Amino acid sequence: MTLNFPLLLVIAVAVCGALALVDLVLFAPRRRAAISSYEGQVNEPDPAVLEKLNKEPLLVEYGKSFFPVLFIVLVLRSFLVEPFQIPSGSMKPTLEVGDFILVNKFAYGIRLPVLDTKVIPIGDPQRGDVMVFRYPSEPNINYIKRVVGLPGDTVRYTKEKRLYVNGELVAEKLVGEEPGTLGSVTLYQEKLGQAEHLIRKEMSRYRIEPDRQWTIPAGHYFMMGDNRDNSNDSRYWNDPKIPKDLLGMVPDRNIVGKAFAVWMSWPDPKMSNLPNFSRVGVIH
């Protein structure tokens, strides 16, 4: 079972806020009245007695202490910036396993926490953006991929591992090779929209599949990983609960935000690796 942290955070803020409000409306006036009554009965009030009469219930004390901190975290995380950790190599070489990234939560519109309803439209995903979204088949799981197809686009991926968008071959330039799990891996520089970035292909690894083509419906996006032969993305999703014409598509309501920076790397196992900052920088 996946932990729904946004829901837990909202509940925690609501509980702490309710405790603070109950104290303000109910308990605090009672404490003030008790202190006033005591002071009217003695000539010299005992500081220890005053402290005892003014003491907040322990639960209220904790609630009032945690409320401002949790509220600030909720606002920052829900509407401004949210941190994520990269769990897989599907976005290599752009993102490595163990990278900690920052995601802009307002780039594509302000959304209500937990409900994820867009209340203030600000912008739309652009081709080439690196985007975090909730996996359509399991919305409690966050994925990160690159936006390849926009609403209305036609995307084609060939058995030769070439990408076409709206009938045009996406430009790519050979960069070099690096070691891979099954032989060498070829690196290319690809340009999607205004975004230039590196992609990885295992040219010696052939997939027995025909050329495939998709037309992106309104309000949906087609996503691919930069590690083209090691990415579970829009090309391969298959869920019988999803209509056939929407298979592989990410609906706008599932968008979490735009990934824009790496702020730390800490690969597993954490106990035998130290955090490092050599990969800190903007995500292209």
UniProtKB/Swiss-Prot annotation:
Keywords: Cell inner membrane, Cell membrane, Hydrolase, Membrane, Protease, Transmembrane, Transmembrane helix. It is found in: Cell inner membrane. Its EC number is 3.4.21.89. Pfam families: Peptidase_S26. GO terms for cellular component: plasma membrane. It is an enzyme of class 3 (hydrolase). SUPFAM superfamilies: LexA/Signal peptidase. Residues 78-284 are periplasmic. It catalyses: Cleavage of hydrophobic, N-terminal signal or leader sequences from secreted and periplasmic proteins. One of its GO terms (biological process) is signal peptide processing. It comes from the Bacteria. It is a multi-pass membrane protein. Residues 23-58 are cytoplasmic. NCBIfam families: sigpep_I_bact (TIGR02227). This is Signal peptidase I. The gene is lepB.
